[in-house]
Structure formats: C-alpha cells, structure tokens
C-alpha cells in the first residue's frame, strides 16, 4: 500500500509537487523517530526548563507553550512523512512556584492547562495561596497530535495572579519544568488531579546569630577605641525572647568601649531595647510613618 501526498499552491496545480512512500517505510521511519526520542528522554536531560515566569498582580494571564522548540523543529522537518502517525505526550509536568510577597499579604494563583487544538481546559489549581511556595506535579492524560503541535495548536500553561499588593507588582515566580515526548503510540489515561507539595521556609538563625559577623559589623561602623593602643573588649550578643507581632531583638550590652556618640544629631542604632531608659537607638518621638514621609518620599 502506498500513500501519495500532494502539496499545491493556491494559484493552481501547475506548481504542485508530489512524492510517494510505502506504508512499511512510513512505519519504519516513525519507529526510528520514536526510539530516538525515547533514548533522549531516558537520558540525563529528560526534563525541559525553558524560563521563569514572573507573575504580576492583576496583569493579563501568562501563557506558555509546553512543546519545546526542539520538538517543533523535528515535527516541521518530518511532518510531511510521519505527521499523521506521531503524537506528543506530556508524561511529566512540574511547576515550581516561589512567592515574592510576604505572608502578611494575601493573594491567589490560578493555574490551568489549555489544549488549544480541542479547546479543553484542565485545572491545576484555581485558588493557590500566593504566599506559599510549592511544587505542582502531574501529567496530561491525552496525546497531542503532532500536526497540531507543529502548527502551534499544542498544550498551553495559563497562569494568573491576584494579590493585595500594588498593581503590576511581582507576586511570585513560576518555574515550569516538563517532559514532551514524541511517539507513534497514543495514550489514554484516567485524568488525575495535580499533586501539590508545599516547600518549607528556611530559618535565618545561622547568619543572624553569628556573633562574629555582628561584632565585626559594630566594630567597623562605630568609633571604638580611637587613639587607644589596646583593642576594645568584645561585646556579647544576647537574643531576647520574641514578643507577638515583634521581631526578635538582639541586645548588645553597653560598656566602656561603646560610647554614646551621635551622628548628624541622631543616635546610632547600636542597641534597640525599648524597655531600657538608657538604651540607645531610635530617638524619642520617632515613627516609621514620619521616616518614610521625610526621608524616603521627601518630594511627595
């Protein structure tokens, strides 16, 4: 049996060209492409990470094609011979989301898969907490026809973010990682929900409570022992208990080597201890609102 395919221009049949290929040759070629792709899929670089998607608050949904340029290049070259026999599978889709907003803010992320060829939508998550880092894992349960994928009618990822922060500000960053496989076999699977794996936050204790770093910071930025032949005595760092709604306080005790100097009329923030009348730090009557208005936004 032979398949004859003809390409004709819109002006008529005079510029047409045709070729013939046997069914056995077509199947052999399809098998070779499928095997070659399977070997590359089983190799160390089986997953694709194309770019990072910055999700902005209230912006238009971000749309990303989940068929790599390499696969589209193969399809465009081989489509005249094997296009009707090949499919694109998405057997692994991972979506790594990292928030850019604080836990005190609120927001939601909507993620969907869109099959442009059929017009069907699959929900990944329609109300994910925008402040929570996580990894989504799943797959698409149907095959995409190679001829559709070559035309750009492939599987799309659609993402939208809404948050309580400023409009068009970065809510978070999404890293899509997927596997797109060429095969002459068509898959038929029962659809399953995407899995979501939360990512725990790290603790800053190691760096923040590093006595050496903080001591060096104080010594480098305060006038200690000027004109003295002896080194100043080291200070001791004492972490205070955390109060609800307040940051943990690091108390640096005063001593003869820590003079109460002022810089431009403002006391240096060597010690922040509101409970002590002798404590240095923020001047009396200081408010963050006035600081922002006078120092950060003086022209507003």
From Swiss-Prot:
Keywords tagged on the record: Host cell junction, Transport, Viral movement protein
Localization in the cell: Host cell junction, Host plasmodesma
Main location: host cell
Disulphide linkage map: none
Superkingdom of source: Viruses
One GO location term (cellular component): host cell plasmodesma
InterPro entries hit by this protein: Bromo_MP
Transmembrane stretches, start-end: none
GO biological process: transport of virus in host, cell to cell
Function: Transports viral genome to neighboring plant cells directly through plasmosdesmata, without any budding. The movement protein allows efficient cell to cell propagation, by bypassing the host cell wall barrier. Acts by forming a tubular structure at the host plasmodesmata, enlarging it enough to allow free passage of virion capsids.
Family that this chain belongs to: Belongs to the alfamovirus movement protein family.
Protein's name according to its UniProt entry: Movement protein
UniProt source species: Alfalfa mosaic virus (strain 425 / isolate Leiden)
